Amino acid sequence: MEKIWLKNYPNDIPAEVDVHAFASLKHVLQRSCERFADLPAYGNMGESISYTQLDRLSRDFAAYLQKSLGLRRGDRVAIMMPNLLQYPVALFGVLRAGMVVVNVNPQYTVPELEHQLRDSGAAAILVLENFAHTLQQVLEKHPELKIRVITTQVGDMFPALKALLTNLAVKYVKKMVPAWRIADVTEFKDALRAGRGQALEDVALQHEDIAFLQYTGGTTGVAKGAVLTHGNMVANVQQLAAWIAHDLLDGKETLLCPLPLYHVYALTCSLVFMKIGAHNVLITNPRDMDAFIEELGKHRFTAMIGVNTLYRALLDAPGFARVDLHSLKIANAGGMAVQRIVAQRWKAVTGVPIVEAYGLTETSPGAISNPLSIEDWTGNIGMPIPSTQAAVLDEEGNETAIGEVGEICVRGPQVMAGYWNRPDETEKVFTSDGWLRTGDMGFMDERGHFKITDRKKDMIIVSGFKVFPNQIEDVVALHPDVEEVAAVGAHDERSGEVVKIIVVRKTLALTEQALLAHCRLHLTDYKLPKIIEFRTEPLPKTNLGKILRRELRDAPKREPQEARAAAATA
């Protein structure tokens, strides 16, 4: 296949990168700790640890896992917490010990946590005690699970007095720690102390060794563990580092990371910035907008990552306009489509465009991105990054013509080895010649830029015509009185499906008729919403901030006064 996008590559970005420059993520970490020893590596809540401290602390945790717990190469170790300084210490400790990281969403319910621990076969788990009660219920239900438990408190990486005050406030003032009781628990601080006095066995890791079991698909069925090897992750770090190299300087950058490290988007971005010696500032709870904005004011951050809903929330926050953004070079977005109105507002306020990128858990996750040189919202996801192939295939597996919609498929060294213990599911997502089926519908233009029209499963079919929810949502979001919107398909006897929109208004003055009039200016008749439902509460989202269309689509019908067929006469 012809890589037509290479004709439009920025001059400073190579077509291929050396994906074999490092044998493993352990080697990436070691090199950064040597090069940037005294620079801050990770920061959180006003405290930070240097690369030297990250090296020492992760070594101690690795030694504890090997010697005190007796875990072996390839054993799975779960990490269940929000963004805290303990996270990178534990993560790199697990990898240095030759073991596999299983990132766990701390908001998981008992059944969700139960599934992930049993499916992964986790031998140990590090959990923030705020969520230990959930783990307790899983262990009580399944006494056969022999999982070693390490607990930590929010302030465990802070100086002694601040740690004491923080932990007391979290537990007794804010009452954020439900009662829990688990036998034979080790505290994180004790684990580090134990490891400090023990020798670390050097594990010779290679590209084929598994680094992460990254669970995905929980919103559409039973979550599956994507097997991400050290080779996958090293490749993606190298690819993305090459993509940003022209704009960023080694040892001089500060990344604002408000997205959780247990999500692969934030995880890999953090690894990329760790490679170049940046200061990774971790935000524990970006939903606390006042505290978030206060934290923004403390740093001269040069790069940030986010999703559409986060950027919009910042723009709507009263204090954001006072934040000094003169040092910002890059605002990257992924996880969901960036709406035109959000991108335009962000550029107007900050002077920096939102650079939209695309990937999946199964691609570690980076696969396609807009170049950093864009000046405004492009409406597409950009070009394949170095050493990556992308194509649009029809249902028979043939490449579509330029501009013709099909399924976006990807090949490259960052593509997962498969799903953990799911050969049947693995077979479903790969073509016979090695393409990963992304499940996203889209097309490639004559410049080699890709545009997503929508998720294959989210597509709405109206009388045989394909309607893409992203387009509907983008149009509705342009209305100044719309806070949030989701478009889904609703059953209809005549047309099979009709477009339904669920809207959160900024003001009750917004009527169905006004919204329909707005839509008619931008949408052809069959794309017009035939059902408009107004809600007062925020729309359901993943922890990354992505609206859960499936949950809205499957929700029981509301009472007539809450959901009306407003467009019946359209």
Which residues make up each language-model segment?
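Conserved beta-loop-beta connector loops within the AMP-binding
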Residues: 358, 377, 391-409, 428, ...
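Conserved AMP-binding/adenylate-forming core of the ANL superfamily
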Residues: 21, 38-72, 78-84, 88-92, ...
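AMP-binding/adenylate-forming catalytic core of the ANL superfamily
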Residues: 87, 108, 115, 125-131, ...
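Structural core segment of the AMP-binding/adenylate-forming
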Residues: 96-193, 507-508
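AMP-dependent adenylate-forming
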Residues: 3-7, 27-50
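Conserved adenylate-forming
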Residues: 68-72, 195-208, 213-256, 268, ...
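Gly/Ser/Thr-rich phosphate-binding loop
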Residues: 149, 164-168, 298-305, 315-376, ...
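Conserved AMP-binding/adenylation subdomain of ANL enzymes
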Residues: 234-254, 264-302, 317
